[in-house]
Structures are given as C-alpha cells and as structure tokens.
Amino acid sequence: MKRYKIGIVPAAGDDAASLMTIASLEEPQMTDLLIPVLYDSKERVERLREGHESDTRFVFLPSAEEAREECVCVVDTSRAAQEADAGDTASALPVWQSDLRDGNIDALVLVGDADIDQCTDGASAVVYLSEADCMALVGREHIAEELEKVVRLLERDLDYSKPRMAVVADTDRQKEEWEAKAEELGAFLYGPFLTETFFEEEQQRNFDVILAFDPATARNCFREAAHAWGVCLAEDGEGRVTLYPAYNTQPMGEDAASFNAISLNRALYSAVDVLRGRARYDEGHTSPLPKLFYERRDERRGGNIE
C-alpha cells in the first residue's frame, strides 16, 4: 500500500511540541504507515533526541523531495531560513508551505499552541474530528455552495456516504435554503437544533455528522463535549490538506502530555485516512473509457504484429 509523505511542523520555540513529535515518530508503526517529513532545526532535533534509545532512524535531508521510506526525514528549517534571508529562495512562504503547494508532501500537520481559527481562516472547508464525532463548519453567506463542498469532502475524504447530519444553529433563518440544497444533494439533514442545548443533552450521539452554522459557539461546545477532542482538518481551494492536533481544553493534570500525544497521533492517522479515502474515491469515480481505449488499442497492435 502506498505510503504518503506527511509533513510535520512543531511550533517554533516550543520544545514540548517538538519533543512530543519526536517521541511519536519514534514509534515503529509510524514509519510503517507513512513517510514522515519533520520540519525542525537540526540542532533542536539532535538536542532533544540525545540519550534516547530508539530503533527509528532520523535522516537529515536538504528537501522533502528526497524523503524516503523506513526512516524519519528531517528538513532543517534553520538552514532554509538562512537561505531565505540570503535571498536564495524565491518564495516568501515557509518551506513546508512551499512543499505542500509544490506536491513534495501530500499533507501537513502543524503541532503546537496555534490559533486554529486564525490558521484556518480562508480555508475552503473545515472539519473537526474527535473520538466518535465529526463536525463541519458551514458559512451562512453562501449556504448552498458551502453545503455542497462539505458533503463532497465528507463522502470523498472521510467515507461518509449519506450520513445522518444534524444542523446546529442559534436561529432557523435560511432554513428553506439549506433544506432545498440538502434535498438536491440527497443528504439527510435534521434540525436546526440550538447549539448549546444540543451538546448539553449529548444529542450528537444520535448523528453521524454535525453541521455548525455558528462556528464560534459550536467549536467551544464541541471541545467541551469531547474527552480528548482530537483534530481540526482544513482543506484549501486547491484540495491541499492541513491538520491541527487540537489539544484537550479540559485540565488533565499529569495526563495532559499523554492526551496531547494521542491528539497528535490521531492527526497523523487522519492525514493518511483522508489521502487513502480520496484516492479510493477518485479511482471509483474516474471514467474507465480512456483506460479501456488504450488497452484495446494495445491489443489490436499486438494482434497486428503477430
């Protein structure tokens, strides 16, 4: 099975995020599942790994293009920053963003105490995943277009076919608009439910997917309802995927670090699941006619040669 290149970026200056990332990638199953590309400074990786006993190899490479299987590939971000300062880089984007744009990596996972709302601003679609629940954000300005994007993402990337979906909103304005679009898409929508009441009564257990029309309120309620609430997935207009481990907001005391690691691992697994799901979906929806044409043509040519 194909192994995808997943870029992982610990927050700059956050040794805890970097240490957690290194510990996660040292687990043997990670390099069996994917090709991890760690964007971090060589100095920090070597310092934090000092004294670690691990069978996982960390290989320092100049770029993600050279990343290979059976090891953790480290792209030295301090070197990339020096080259950018020297004017050797045409793009002002961070190296990991450039690699995602150019197809050198298949997905990106950003680790650390980032403002997820700010990071996902302008994304084409945003989905939150916890252990059992899935919540997608739907903008009010262009409901029909937003619903179509979300339903397509759920079916293509997360294998939700005709899910039972609950609309949570603090008003039923525009209800006729989204009901008409849902009927056109063949989606099963229920609601709208008041956001806070919906989560207080744990009604999310009765549905496969939550569609949130009031993102700010819904995000807070979703996070509080989840035990270790998992992952935020954002897709841009070109279909590129970035995931954010969304650390538990509940005080966990000494267990906080372990729950954060669970969230990070879930983000890595989710990245692979999304890419595999997308490939399977695209393969199933690709017309077989071009392939048949070339196969038949080759058969005819072979027959003529004989």
How should these model regions be labeled?
Residues M1-E306:
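Anion-binding alpha/beta catalytic cores of soluble intermediary-metabolism enzymes, centered on
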